[in-house]
Every structure is written in C-alpha cells, then in structure tokens.
Design a protein with these regions (language model features):
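An N-terminally biased module of ancient metal coordination in phosphate/nucleic-acid-related enzymes
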Residues: 1-88, 173-180, 188-218
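Short, flexible segments with low predicted structural confidence
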Residues: 12, 98, 167-169
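Mid-domain alpha/beta scaffold segments of enzyme catalytic cores
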Residues: 35, 46, 53-117, 121, ...
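Short aromatic/hydrophobic-glycine micro-motifs
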Residues: 45, 131-132, 163, 202
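Amphipathic alpha-helical segments that form well-ordered structural scaffolds
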Residues: 121-125, 157, 192, 196
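Hydrophobic, aromatic-enriched interface-forming segments
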Residues: 132-185
C-alpha cells in the first residue's frame, strides 16, 4: 500500500481515518486486497476505498476477507478510470458505482480491450524495432487474474527480458510518447467516464488534480 497521510474526514480528533485511493495487485498495486485490509487495520484506518485502474475486482475479495475479521472497518467500492482529453491523460475516480449497470459493464470492457490492444502493439514494436521479444502472457501474468495490465507491467517485462537494467530505465527509454515503440492507449474521455459513473449511482472525482494542467478546464 502506498504510504500517504490518512485522511480525517470530519476534521476533528474524533474523525474517521481513511484512505480513499488505494490500488491492489488487480492493477498497478503490489499487495492483494486481503493484505491491504490487514495493513489498513495496522495503520489504524477505519475506512478505505479500493480504486484499481479500470476494474472493480478487488472489492469483493476484500469484503469476503473482512467477514473473517471481528472489526469495525469499511471497504468502499471504487475505481480509477484512465481517460484521455486533448492529449492529456486524466484519471477519474468513481465511488459507490452500481457495477451491475450495463453501461458500467460496457465501460470496463472498453477499458480492458484498450489496455490489451495497447500492450500487444507495444510488444510488437519492441520486437520489431528493438529486438526485445516479450510474450503477451509474460505481461498478463504480472497482475491478478482479470486485472488491468498497463505500462508498469510492460516496463517490468522489458527489464525481465534483459532489455534494460531497471524498470526506471525501461520507462525512460520506451514507455513515453517520444519513444518509437510507444503506442497511446485509445480510451474514453473523462466526460464519458463521469457520465457512466453518475448513471451507475456513483460519485466521480478527478484524481490527483494538481498534476493535471487542464484540471480547471474540465
């Protein structure tokens, strides 16, 4: 779990301590949902939101595990949708979505398809232009079953294949727009994501807005 200050949601000493932006190994996180619950309890948190990139698989795993614990602790279902707007990558957090809604299910399918397509195209170019041969399954197996593959996994696969000496080197050489082997992920707009989250009864929020130059324009 990433180290970040716990949030006191009421502002006073009696407030609820929580972390509302956590990833698991169902996307680019390191830990399982069960481990996240344990670490959160150890940190004295009372509520967390699991917001993996483009999937909601960790929530059911975490809540099932929580049933084995005799604790007052809340797990919120969430998601972080990767979107594109005018060549900017904008991440939209969604809290409390009804995942049974057809539009929400379709959004997940679109996002997963885009991730798979991007990964396969980058791997093809790595082999063709750089001689770095990586099987798609080598990337896919880096996330939990059904999880979201992405750039961190591609970078790690490049390093594992001997293409670079470190993951950071893989990023600096290959995983950026100026790289001859990089392919942009064709994904939905932030407006699409917000609409689907709203329509599914969820609450949309721009993730890390201070890192986005155009956040105020959205």
């Amino acid at each position: 779990m990433k180290a970040r200050p716990a949030l006191n949601t009421t502002g006073g000493k009696g407030g609820v301590k929580g972390d509302f932006h956590i990833h698991t190994y169902y996307s680019d996180g390191v830990f399982s949902p069960e481990k996240i619950v344990d670490l959160s309890l150890e940190a004295g948190l009372q509520v967390i939101a699991l917001t993996d990139h483009d999937n909601v698989l960790s929530y059911d795993v975490a809540t099932e595990y929580l049933k084995t614990k005799n604790v007052d602790f809340t797990v919120i279902r969430g998601i972080e949708v990767n979107t594109l707007y005018k060549d900017y990558e904008v991440h939209i957090l969604g809290y409390f979505p009804d995942v049974t809604k057809s539009d929400f299910k379709n959004l997940l399918k679109i996002q997963q398809h885009a991730r798979i397509k991007q990964t396969k195209e980058i791997l093809h170019l790595l082999a063709k232009k750089e001689g770095i041969k990586i099987a798609f399954d080598d990337v896919k197996n880096m996330v939990a079953e059904g999880g979201s593959i992405g750039r961190p996994h591609i970078a790690k696969a490049i390093t594992n294949a001997g293409g670079t000496s470190s993951v950071m080197e893989a990023y600096s050489k290959y995983i950026h727009r100026a790289s001859p082997v990089y392919v942009e992920r064709k994904t939905v707009t932030p407006f699409d994501a917000v609409e689907v989250i709203y329509d599914s009864g969820g609450i949309p929020v721009i993730a890390h807005p201070y890192d986005i130059d155009i956040a105020e324009k959205l």
